Amino acid sequence: GYSSAASDVYKRQTSVCIPPAYVKQVKEYVQDKMAVCTVIGFPNGYMTTAAKEFETRDALTNGADEIDMVINISDVKNGDYDKVEQEIIALKAECGNRILKVIVETCYLTEEEKIAMCQAVTNAGADYIKTSTGFGTGGATLGDVKLFREHIGEAVRIKAAGGVSTREDFEAFLDAGCDRIGSSSGVALLTKKA
């Protein structure tokens, strides 16, 4: 059995994010004790919207509770913000009441593009804007989180991922306005003494 400390950590973690191929197996294991999340369009978001819709439906059928989608960075770089927004709308429609997080991969975007993505995510009705996949050239920064907080709608939450590895980082990102932190060091962050 779990010790009380381990049990407390388990309760404080919101979800576990895993590859789509393992959603069904992990959902059967965790059942309703923890939300199961998977990433659609990983890692660069270059597939078509139809492919992302299929991938989303498949993940939800297999038991995913939350979907993280990767935007098509090329569409952003080409200034086709409406196309990005329409894709988010399509995937949110597939998700229904389930949580949709939109990964914008901030390390590749200019400030103008980040602000445009805040607007697209807000307009499309997504639940979260997320900084990064963890596979880009950089992860979350406090500056990006503060920029998001200034430019997203009130209903949109912020998730920082990548680069949050110490208790000090964790607290700084929460103070900057994050609603969730994605970290491969989650258990260690929650169990270390302050």
Language-model regions, residue ranges each:
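Single conserved hydrophobic/aromatic residue that forms the stacking wall/gate
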Residues: 1-6, 10
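Conserved, mostly hydrophobic/aromatic
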Residues: 26, 59, 102, 129, ...
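Catalytic cores of alpha/beta
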Residues: 47-56, 109-120, 164-179
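Hydrophobic faces of well-ordered beta-strands that scaffold small-molecule active sites
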Residues: 16-18, 36-40, 67-69, 100-104, ...
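Active-site-adjacent beta->alpha loops and helix N-cap segments on the catalytic face
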Residues: 18-33, 47-51, 74-94, 109-114, ...
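Structural motif
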Residues: 11, 62, 94-95, 124, ...
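Generic structural signal for hydrophobic
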Residues: 8, 59, 91, 120-121, ...
